[in-house]
Swiss-Prot record:
The keyword Signal applies. This is GPI alpha-1,4-mannosyltransferase I, stabilizing subunit. It comes from Mus musculus. Pathway: Glycolipid biosynthesis; glycosylphosphatidylinositol-anchor biosynthesis. The chain crosses the membrane at residues 227-247. GO terms for cellular component: endoplasmic reticulum membrane. Belongs to the PIGX family. Residues 1-22 form the signal peptide.
Length: 254
């Protein structure tokens, strides 16, 4: 009886040791699979350069791992410009001719002279270029300008919020890492001067800032009477000086 109990204990101990050894040998493999399944992040950062009413919107995109295998890929940024700002399509055309940017406006009816309260959101496509100083980075810039805003009663500034853009990528071949980032497909021109339409992958990314904000100085309503009076006086003065110069130095023939 005692011998049988000892035998059963030995068998149970042997089974337990084997089970622990199997679990230990499988642990590194499982951990390795977990590491391989973790996707690196795409980091996007945008900021305003320059001061005053004419700024440059700089957009930088950094991939979480080397993109040496993604040299055949193109990056497209679809940005939505709020009504408080505008992009000059003629300025973009001039920059494209000098090969300084690859951006084109999607909005057809666009008035750069319209004030903020009569304007709508506009969309711009920007074909990003690889950053020469960072092998894993792309960058693009877009010149933007402030619109005229209604005067305020108290505060002399207004806040403009620039939302994060859509990030699109198109590759000539499939890469496993793209499955980590891609969310959906969007139809867009394959290149700036191409009429061919490609299916770009909408990429998931992490932004440094939730939203980019900028303060724009505006007039105050309490200054309306003063501004109108001074403007009228200057207009009358200049008109009078012009008429005096015409009568004094002009040559009239009947």
């Amino acid at each position: 009886m005692a011998a049988g109990a000892v035998a059963w204990l030995l068998l149970w101990a042997a089974w337990l040791v084997g089970r622990l050894a199997a679990d230990f040998s499988d642990a590194p493999f499982s951990a390795g699979k977990g590491v391989r399944a973790t996707c690196s992040e795409i980091i996007l950062r945008q900021e305003f350069l320059k001061d005053g009413f004419h700024r440059d919107l700089l957009i930088k995109v950094k991939f979480g791992e080397s993109i040496e295998d993604l040299q055949t890929c193109r990056l497209l940024i679809k940005h939505y410009i709020p009504p408080g700002l505008f992009v000059d399509p003629y300025e973009l055309a001039s920059l494209r001719e000098r090969n300084l940017t690859e951006a084109v406006m999607l909005s057809e009816s666009f008035n750069i002279e319209a004030p903020n309260y009569l304007s709508n959101e506009s969309a711009v496509l920007i074909y990003a270029r690889q950053d020469a100083q960072c092998i894993d980075c792309f960058q693009a810039f877009l010149p933007v300008h402030y619109r005229y805003h209604r005067p305020h009663k108290k505060d002399g500034d207004t806040l403009i919020v620039v939302n994060n853009p859509d990030l699109l990528m198109y590759c000539d071949q499939e890469f496993p890492i793209l499955k980590c980032w891609a969310q959906s497909e969007v139809a867009a021109p394959c290149a700036l001067k191409s009429e061919e339409i490609c299916q770009w992958k909408s990429m998931q990314y992490k932004s440094i800032l939730k939203n980019l904000t900028v303060q724009v100085p505006v007039g105050l309503t309490i200054h309306t009477s003063l501004v109108c009076s001074v403007t009228l006086l200057i207009t009358i003065l200049c008109s009078t000086l012009i008429l005096l110069a015409v009568f004094k130095y002009g040559h009239f023939s009947l």
